[in-house]
């Protein structure tokens, strides 16, 4: 699995100060520390990930290498071309060992081309926008290819020279006992080249921080956490490598009336106690405007009415969900004397009829009576 961007891990911007980075790390360390989360392997993974990110971004030299080359600048195993699980190229590894023994020299020159980092953008949209789809513009900070030197890092009219330490391979051999092991060149950070006359715009990095504005189409039916991929809109690659992608993550704003549950919508429906007792027709809101609904007599609080097809049509579906209205019978307030008089009269009639008009209350009183006997 590819490593996450270190800035994303700590939840800070790429231009974050040392203090902001330290504060973000402390917060995550407190949250995911193994002592606070025993028997929780996920928390331990998050803790290690945050620690690794902090160790790089809190060191000026490592951070500069990471900003310029991504994970490959601080971790040799992250270089492009590594196989599954970080084992690298099998033939290259054994070529280095046996090449030294038998004179084969199987390493060869590497291009050290790295793909740009993927970026993440959190976008908040309304429930209506999620249901109908929308198009909006966003402005994001990225590491883009320097237009002055076209990514070479060298002043226009000049070219980078071959690294004298690794001879342009991007890696150096270290002798360990009988074996020769390859490591990323500490001088050129794996690029195989050195810039003698740096570009005045990017100062030799080949990339510059920029803000770019993009138009994002949000399809109808998206839900919380859905990701929209914009290919090639991430950070610029290194040494001519392909750019990364941008992932727009959808978050839904809290709606004043509706709560979403997949394709279905839920809302509370307050009705007067007279409508609840006698029945009637009420008007309720939907995403398509108002709709009329009949309330049957003797409706109680907690009753749920369903309006088919008044929910949301999810992505990759041809059917709309439903709208569920949850009844709340309102008790009248700020009564006039006349209203109080009528309610007392109603209560007297109810008592005279042995509570048959309030079956739940009668049943409850019977249970209470039996309890104390």
From Swiss-Prot:
In the UniProt entry, what is the domain comment?
The J domain is necessary and sufficient to stimulate DnaK ATPase activity. Zinc center 1 plays an important role in the autonomous, DnaK-independent chaperone activity of DnaJ. Zinc center 2 is essential for interaction with DnaK and for DnaJ activity.
Provide the gene name from the record.
dnaJ
User: Which cysteines form disulfides?
Assistant: none
Task: Quote the biased-composition stretches of kind Basic and acidic residues, using this chain's numbering.
Answer: 354-373
Q: What does this protein do?
A: Participates actively in the response to hyperosmotic and heat shock by preventing the aggregation of stress-denatured proteins and by disaggregating proteins, also in an autonomous, DnaK-independent fashion. Unfolded proteins bind initially to DnaJ; upon interaction with the DnaJ-bound protein, DnaK hydrolyzes its bound ATP, resulting in the formation of a stable complex. GrpE releases ADP from DnaK; ATP binding to DnaK triggers the release of the substrate protein, thus completing the reaction cycle.
Q: Which family does it belong to?
A: Belongs to the DnaJ family.
Where is the J domain positioned along the sequence? 5-70
Keyword line: Chaperone, Cytoplasm, DNA replication, Metal-binding, Repeat, Stress response, Zinc, Zinc-finger
**What is one GO cellular-component annotation here?**
cytoplasm
Q: CDD domains annotated for this entry?
A: DnaJ, DnaJ_C, DnaJ_zf
The cofactor binding remark recorded in the entry reads: Binds 2 Zn(2+) ions per monomer.
Pfam name, any one: DnaJ_CXXCXGXG
Q: Which sequence ranges does the entry mark as zinc finger (CR-type)?
A: 133-211
Which cofactors is this protein said to need? Zn(2+)
Question: Assembly state and interactors?
Answer: Homodimer.
**Where in or outside the cell is it found?**
Cytoplasm
Predominant place of localization: cytoplasm
Q: Does the keyword Metal-binding apply?
A: yes
- What domain of life does the native source organism fall in? Bacteria
> Could you cite one Gene Ontology molecular function of this protein?
unfolded protein binding
Annotated residues that bind Zn(2+) 2 are located at 163, 166, 185, 188
- What protein name does the entry list? Chaperone protein DnaJ
Q: State where Zn(2+) 1 binds.
A: 146, 149, 199, 202
Q: Where are the CXXCXGXG motif repeats?
A: 146-153, 163-170, 185-192, 199-206
Q: Which GO terms describe its biological process?
A: chaperone cofactor-dependent protein refolding; DNA replication; protein refolding; response to heat
Q: Where is this region: Disordered?
A: 346-373
